Amino acid sequence: MSETDEVVIYTDGACKGNPGPGGWGALLVYKGVEKELWGGDPSTTNNRMELMAAIAGLIALTRPCSVKLVTDSQYVMKGIQEWLPNWKKRGWKTASKEPVKNADLWQKLDEEVNRHQVSWQWVRGHTGHPGNERADQLANRGVDEVRSAR
């Protein structure tokens, strides 16, 4: 697969209160075609929404793909690149032998990542990066829909 065959997924999570109502957004771009995904949860955390955005973006791919996943979440980046291998070795426990927070979502993300060839890119949030800004708007749409459903 050449770089032009790569799917780029921009992800973001949002939470109004932490915990509180939250939303996630993902923008998938493939050969100039865009697909927008979003959703929310009435009681969640920003970290869970960041993870959900990445999971939803990867689940939306119907076959194994070459993926560049772009996030502004240091939590997701450090988790996937540094912490995850050790958590798995320790049976989903931290270095201090505590259960991993959000283990359900980390396990699902790990499962989805293993279906694809994924490279990860961190971008600073709220700096005008078009894909990240759009993912942020989608995440906030998820929050708004959860709040209006109450």
Curated annotation (Swiss-Prot):
Keyword DNA damage: no
Cofactor binding description: Binds 1 Mg(2+) ion per subunit. May bind a second metal ion at a regulatory site, or after substrate binding.
RNase H type-1 domain residues: 3-144
Keywords annotated in UniProt: Cytoplasm, Endonuclease, Hydrolase, Magnesium, Metal-binding, Nuclease
InterPro entries attached to this UniProt entry: RNase_H (IPR050092), RNaseH-like_sf (IPR012337), RNaseH_domain (IPR002156), RNaseH_sf (IPR036397), RNaseHI (IPR022892)
GO biological process, one term: DNA replication, removal of RNA primer
Cellular compartments annotated: Cytoplasm
Protein name (database record): Ribonuclease H
Species assigned in the record: Ectopseudomonas mendocina (strain ymp) (Pseudomonas mendocina)
